[in-house]
Regions:
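Transmembrane alpha-helices and adjacent helix-loop boundaries
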Residues: 1-234
Length: 234
C-alpha cells in the first residue's frame, strides 16, 4: 500500500484552479441539483399524494399511475430519457442545459416516493377529521388545507427526511448525463492524478456531511412541529 498524498488537492488541474477548488465546485453543483430536485419532488409529490386520497376516482387513478410509473422505472433510465429522448421529441428543449433536465428527472423520480408518503400520512389520520371539516361548512379543498394537511405533513417528516438524504445520494447518478457533480469530479480527477483513494475518501466524506446535516436540520424541525399522540409525537 502506497503513501497517501493529500497535497494533490493543492495541485493545479491545468485549468487555472486546484483540485480542491474543483471538488468544492462539484460539491456546490451536487447540492444545487439536490435542492432543486427536492423542491420539485415536494411540490409534485405532495399534489399527487393529495389526489390519491380524494373521492374522485379519476384523480386517484391519475395519481396511482404517476406514482407507479416514476417509482418502477430505474432512476438512471429516467435520466437518460430526459437527457437523450425528451429533447429529440421536443426540439425546443434542446436549448435547455442538461443540468436542468437532470433536475427534472431526479425530481420526478423522487416525487413518486413522496406522493406515497403524503398519501400514507393523510390516510393515517382519523376519518372523523375529514368529516368534521366538511360538517362545519368547509369545502373539500379547505378541509385539506386547514384540517388534514397540517397534521399529515407533521406525520411524514421522518420519511421526508429520508428522501431528502436520499436525493443527495441519488444525485451521484447525474454524472452519467454530464453534470459536473462530485462523482463526475471523482472519476475525472482520480484518472488524472492516479490517486483514487484520496479522491474518493474526500468525496465520500462530503456526501456524509451533506446527508448528516440534512438529518440534523430535519430532526430539529420534527421536534418543533411534532404532534403529541400522533406518529413521532410524545
Amino acid at each position: 500500500m502506497g503513501t497517501w498524498d493529500w497535497q494533490i488537492f493543492l495541485q493545479d488541474t491545468g485549468g487555472g484552479r486546484t483540485y480542491l477548488e474543483w471538488m468544492m465546485s462539484a460539491w456546490g453543483w451536487t447540492m444545487l441539483v439536490s435542492v432543486l430536485a427536492l423542491a420539485i419532488a415536494l411540490v409534485i409529490g405532495s399534489l399527487i399524494g393529495i389526489l390519491r386520497t380524494t373521492p374522485s376516482k379519476a384523480l386517484v387513478l391519475f395519481g396511482d399511475a404517476w406514482t407507479e410509473l416514476f417509482r418502477n422505472i430505474p432512476l438512471l433510465v429516467q435520466l437518460f430519457i430526459w437527457y437523450h429522448v425528451i429533447p429529440r421529441l421536443f426540439p425546443a428543449l434542446q436549448a435547455i442545459p442538461g443540468i436542468y433536465l437532470a433536475v427534472f428527472g431526479l425530481g420526478f423520480f423522487t416525487s413518486a416516493r413522496i406522493a406515497e408518503q403524503v398519501r400514507a400520512g393523510i390516510m393515517a389520520l382519523p376519518k372523523g377529521q375529514r368529516y368534521a371539516g366538511l360538517a362545519i361548512g368547509l369545502t373539500l379543498p379547505q378541509t385539506y388545507r386547514y384540517v388534514l394537511l397540517p397534521m399529515a405533513f407533521r406525520i411524514v417528516i421522518p420519511p421526508i427526511t429520508s428522501e431528502s438524504m436520499n436525493i443527495i445520494k441519488n444525485s451521484s447518478v447525474t454524472f452519467a448525463v454530464q453534470v459536473s457533480e462530485l462523482i463526475f469530479f471523482a472519476l475525472q480527477s482520480s484518472e488524472e492524478t492516479s490517486r483514487p483513494i484520496e479522491i474518493y475518501a474526500c468525496v465520500t466524506a462530503l456526501y456524509f456531511v451533506s446527508a448528516f446535516a440534512v438529518n440534523r436540520v430535519m430532526a430539529v424541525v420534527e421536534h418543533r412541529v411534532q404532534v403529541p399522540g400522533m406518529i413521532g409525537g410524545k
